[in-house]
């Protein structure tokens, strides 16, 4: 009896699979892992597989930005229309995340990952073959966004949180960093492919490679997470006394403000991320330099995401949001007066270092100020708002370029949206301090 408490769990075995029934299908879920699997080597190995899957599944978000100048020239469309594949992809990503999360809960995460592999793989291949601009856009939104990327973000983050207790925060941060790792790796790889074999062949190769690799990795994710009681909130994340009046506002008003804040910060964030390659091309530096800047930006974003998580544990979600918003605004301002090659590299690095912690801070804010029973739905809603912001901002920047002939107005537009985000964060901070003062001054009721 005592030995089972000391048995080290190393992963699913053949007997596990036999008990599950191999006739259920190659990607059918295995039974839940034992509780000894939590924080184990098997969990660490699963986290590594998760990181690979998110890095592969998120590639389309960044490859589409790299090929934008070639797509615009090939299809003979405007810069705004060339931005629409990214816009539709992000909208599909946001909607699909909720659908794939529901599928993962019912059928196991491997099922959603297989659909993701099919979506990313077929999306790349069909987009590379089509000669219709609107079909090209719809493929990005439906196959690559709705089915593909969505399967490798929210479901993987949720799954990771169930395999860790002591190191849950850093595990989730590592998992979420796969999205930025994709941004650090794929732009340069895609640009090399575009320069050597063209964007269409690059898409075909990415499609075949992604489909096969993601499907094989999904086989390693069939084990259901250990069954355990609801987790205890992390230290320093206690809810406010009256969770029905977050920030001294109604829950609907407070949530609506966070939704708009998420939208606004990502409209601003999307300008450099979506258009830096095209911007460098227009300045005469070439698409390759722009791809390098995008990779640098997102490599620094990985560092930013991890460091911001540690900062958030110390100062809370709302202050982390304000800090990130101020710094992101400073980075956007640096793009206005400087357009030299070295200056753009520096501005890209600073932008990556400054903005990585903004989006994760919304989850902490909701955990700190709203009822825990509503956390899942509210976090999902605000994260979707950030994706809508990325989609809207990518299109708006392209449209402003078409209207003005440069990206100067697009950067100013991004700064304006960033100010809206900061204004909401400051307002919520003021409302929270005021509600706490009123609570302290109110007479105690016997």
Predicted regions and their residues:
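C-terminal transmembrane helical hairpin of 12-TM major facilitator-type secondary transporters
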Residues: 297-301, 307, 312-365
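A late C-terminal transmembrane helix in Major Facilitator Superfamily
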Residues: 183, 369-404
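Cytoplasmic helix-loop-helix junction between adjacent transmembrane helices
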Residues: 140-177
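Helix-loop-helix hairpin linking two adjacent transmembrane segments in secondary transporters
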Residues: 179-225
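Hydrophobic core of transmembrane alpha-helices in multi-pass small-molecule transporters
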Residues: 135-150, 263, 343-356
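Extracytoplasmic
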Residues: 45-79, 100, 186-187, 272-277
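Extracytoplasmic gate region of multi-pass secondary transporters
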Residues: 64-68, 252-306
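Conserved MFS/SLC helix-loop-helix module at the cytosolic interface between two early adjacent transmembrane helices
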Residues: 95-133, 312
């Amino acid at each position: 009896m005592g030995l089972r408490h000391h048995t080290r769990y190393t992963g699913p075995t053949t007997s596990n699979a036999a008990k599950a029934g191999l006739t259920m299908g190659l990607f059918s879920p295995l039974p839940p892992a034992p509780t000894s699997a939590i924080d184990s080597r098997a969990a660490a190995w699963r986290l590594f597989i998760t990181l690979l899957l998110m890095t592969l599944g998120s590639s389309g978000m960044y490859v589409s930005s790299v090929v934008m100048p070639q797509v615009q020239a090939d299809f003979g469309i405007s810069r705004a229309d060339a931005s629409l594949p990214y816009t539709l992809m992000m909208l599909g990503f946001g909607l699909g995340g909720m659908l794939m999360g529901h599928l993962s809960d019912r059928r196991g995460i491997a099922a959603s990952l297989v659909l993701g592999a099919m979506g990313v793989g077929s999306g790349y291949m069909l987009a590379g073959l089509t000669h219709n601009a609107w079909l090209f856009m719809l493929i990005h939104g439906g196959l690559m966004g709705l089915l593909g990327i969505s399967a490798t973000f929210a479901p993987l983050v949720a799954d990771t949180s169930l395999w860790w207790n002591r190191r849950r925060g850093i595990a989730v941060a590592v998992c979420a960093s796969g999205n930025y790792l994709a941004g650090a790796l794929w732009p340069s790889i895609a640009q090399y492919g575009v320069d050597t074999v063209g964007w269409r062949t690059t898409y075909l190769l990415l499609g075949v490679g992604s489909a096969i690799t993601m499907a094989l990795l999904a086989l390693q994710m069939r084990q259901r997470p250990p069954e355990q009681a609801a987790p205890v909130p992390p230290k320093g994340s206690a809810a406010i006394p009256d969770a029905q009046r977050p920030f001294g506002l109604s829950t609907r008003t407070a949530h609506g403000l966070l939704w708009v804040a998420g939208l606004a910060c990502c409209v601003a964030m999307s300008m450099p991320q979506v258009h830096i390659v095209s911007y460098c091309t227009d300045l005469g530096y070439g698409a390759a330099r722009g791809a390098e800047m995008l990779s640098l930006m997102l490599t620094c974003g990985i560092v930013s995401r991890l460091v911001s998580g540690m900062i958030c544990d110390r100062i809370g979600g709302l202050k982390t949001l304000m800090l990130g918003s101020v710094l992101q605004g400073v980075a956007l301002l640096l793009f206005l007066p400087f357009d030299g090659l070295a200056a753009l590299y520096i501005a890209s690095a600073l932008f990556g270092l400054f903005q990585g912690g903004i989006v994760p801070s919304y989850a902490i804010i909701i955990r700190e100020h709203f009822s825990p029973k509503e956390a899942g739905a509210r976090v999902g809603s605000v994260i979707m708002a950030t994706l809508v912001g990325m989609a809207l901002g990518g299109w708006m920047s392209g449209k402003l370029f078409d209207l003005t002939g440069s990206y100067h107005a697009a950067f100013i537009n991004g700064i304006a949206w960033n100010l809206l985000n900061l204004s909401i964060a400051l307002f919520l901070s003021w409302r929270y301090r005021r509600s706490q003062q009123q609570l302290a001054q109110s007479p105690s009721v016997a």
